[in-house]
């Protein structure tokens, strides 16, 4: 699992994340290997209610270990892609692989940028009102760095202009 990702553009809806190579031997992690094989992936928004479980399945287990079982998270079938999504997630994006870009020299510490097109959005009805996600109900967390995460409960709005005044 990855606690960080970024939107790229909206036409088509595109998203990216950056898996690193394993720290002790530089090999590609299972997430990347699975994406290479299936050409598909799912991104789930992590709410604080299952943040600890998300971190628990980030351990680099051998590929024969099921992180769903070790973390006690629950997979559910996706609608359009093979990889499952999380039943705990109130927002999930089913994605088709667009491209993988390798960054660095292929050793530990280097990594990849994975770019995918979102082909299906899942948004729980309980957190969606008038065309907007209610952040207080989603209660998302984000990774800052290392073992540090943040909550989205102290935010403010800054209105930006789409184009300059005439």
Named regions from a protein language model:
Residues 1-166:
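Basic, polyanion-binding surface patches
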């Amino acid at each position: 699992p990855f606690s960080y990702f970024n939107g790229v553009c909206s036409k088509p809806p595109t998203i990216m994340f950056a898996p690193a190579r394993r720290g002790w031997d530089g090999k590609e992690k299972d997430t990347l290997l699975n994406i290479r094989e299936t050409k598909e992936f799912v991104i789930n928004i992590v709410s604080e209610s299952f943040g600890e479980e998300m971190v628990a399945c980030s351990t680099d287990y051998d590929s024969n270990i099921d992180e769903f079982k070790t973390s006690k998270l629950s997979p559910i079938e996706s609608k359009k892609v093979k990889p499952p999504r999380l039943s705990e997630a109130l927002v999930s994006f089913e994605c088709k692989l667009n491209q993988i870009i390798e960054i660095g020299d292929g050793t530990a510490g280097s990594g990849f940028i994975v770019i995918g097109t979102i082909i299906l959005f899942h948004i729980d009805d309980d957190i969606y009102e008038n065309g907007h996600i209610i952040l207080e109900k989603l209660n998302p967390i984000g990774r800052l760095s290392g073992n540090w995460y943040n909550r989205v409960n102290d935010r403010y709005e800054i209105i930006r202009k789409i184009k300059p005044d005439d």
